[in-house]
Amino acid sequence: MSDVKKLLKKHGQLNHLDAVKVVSHVQRDKDDWILNTVMLEGYDVPFQYNRKKQYKSLTGAQVNLTFYAESKTVAGIAIEMMRVVRIRRS
């Protein structure tokens, strides 16, 4: 059984996407971390994850993502975001 299938089976709320194209990738400082925001082709929701250092831009690349759906409140408005736990180039 693959790592992804094991993760999905163990964590019921976890979702996975294969070979999706990255339309936009933004990296910005947030405390001691780099906050990465990725927009994917065919999705209107931002996918976010943290890293300790900056990485090469993923814009135009195909990636595999494992993520949780969550909602954040910004200025009193609930916004849907995806919290990425695993991202890999496909």
What are these regions (language model features)?
Residues 41, 55-57, 75:
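Amphipathic alpha-helical interaction segments
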Residues 68-90:
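OB-fold/S1-family single-stranded nucleic acid-binding modules
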Residues 29-44:
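Short, basic/aromatic beta-hairpin or loop at an interaction surface
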Residues 43-44, 63-70:
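Generic short beta-strand segments
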Residues 47-49:
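A short, exposed loop/beta-hairpin motif centered on an aromatic-Gly-Thr core
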Residues 2-32, 86-90:
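Structural detector for short beta-strands of small beta-barrel domains
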Residues 51-65:
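Short nucleic-acid-contacting surface segments enriched for D/E, G, S/T with interspersed K/R
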Residues 34-36, 59-63, 78-83:
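A generic structural signal for short beta-strands and their flanking turns/coil linkers
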